[in-house]
């Protein structure tokens, strides 16, 4: 994820990793942000 205004937090809706806040990635199957291991 990226540090930008409006980034999505854990379990926030997303389409791609860049929609999520830092250390989060978009889980394609559920279309929500989750911890990416960083």
UniProtKB/Swiss-Prot annotation:
Determine if Secreted is one of this entry's keywords.
yes
Site residues (Responsible for the inhibition of BgNaV1 fast inactivation), renumbered to this chain: 37-38
| Single annotated GO MF | sodium channel regulator activity
Record remark on domains: The presence of a 'disulfide through disulfide knot' structurally defines this protein as a knottin.
Function description:
Paralytic toxin that inhibits insect voltage-gated sodium (Nav) and calcium (Cav) channels in P.americana (American cockroach) dorsal unpaired median (DUM) neurons, and inhibits the B.germanica (German cockroach) Nav channel (BgNaV1). Also shows a delay in fast inactivation when tested on BgNaV1. May act as a gating-modifier toxin on Nav and as a pore blocker on Cav. In vivo, reversibly paralyzes both L.cuprina (Australian sheep blowfly) and M.domestica (housefly), but does not affect larvae of H.armigera (cotton bollworms).
Q: Which family does it belong to?
A: Belongs to the neurotoxin 10 (Hwtx-1) family. 28 (Jztx-11) subfamily.
Q: What is this protein called?
A: Mu/omega-theraphotoxin-Mb1a
């Amino acid at each position: 994820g990226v540090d930008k205004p409006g980034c999505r937090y854990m379990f926030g809706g997303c389409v791609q990793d860049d929609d999520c806040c830092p250390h989060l990635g978009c889980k394609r199957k559920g279309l929500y942000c989750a911890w990416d291991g960083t």
